[in-house]
C-alpha cells in the first residue's frame, strides 16, 4: 500500500506543479478521472484499499495539501472578488483552498466508488464538476454520455 501512496503523491506533485490556470486544472482533472477509471491504477489501489489508518491519513493529508497549494496559486484579481484565469475562466476570490481541496478529495473518493459500481464515469465527473465549479474546470456531461448501468443507473444527469 505504501508504494501506491508514494506513486500517487509523486505523480500528483509533478502534475499539480504545472497547473497555473483553469485550463490546466481541467487537464489535471481529466488525467485523474482516467486514472480512477483504470482498474489497476495506483490511484484506484490508493483510494479503495483499506490500510493502516495513520498511513492513509498521512497520504490523504499530503494529497489535500498539494491540491490546496495548487488552488491557492491560481491567478486572482482581488479587487472584484473574481479571478480571471488566462483561459478566460473565472473563480471567486473568496474560495477557501483548504476546504475546496477536501471537497475535491471527497469527490474523487466517492465519485470513483459510484463510478466503479455503475461502470460509468458519470458519477465521478458529476462530483468533480461540483467540486471544481469555482474554477470552471468541468467536463461536458451532455446527452452524448453513456447510459449508466447498475444500481445507481436510474440517476439522471
Give the ranges of each region predicted by the language model.
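Short, basic, alpha-helical segments at the C-terminal edge of helix-turn-helix-like DNA-binding modules
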Residues: 2-9
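Intrinsically disordered, low-complexity terminal tails and inter-domain linkers enriched
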Residues: 76-94, 140-156
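Hydrophobic alpha-helical connector segments
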Residues: 13-41, 101-104
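Amphipathic alpha-helical packing segments from all-alpha helical-bundle domains
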Residues: 10, 53-87, 98-102, 122, ...
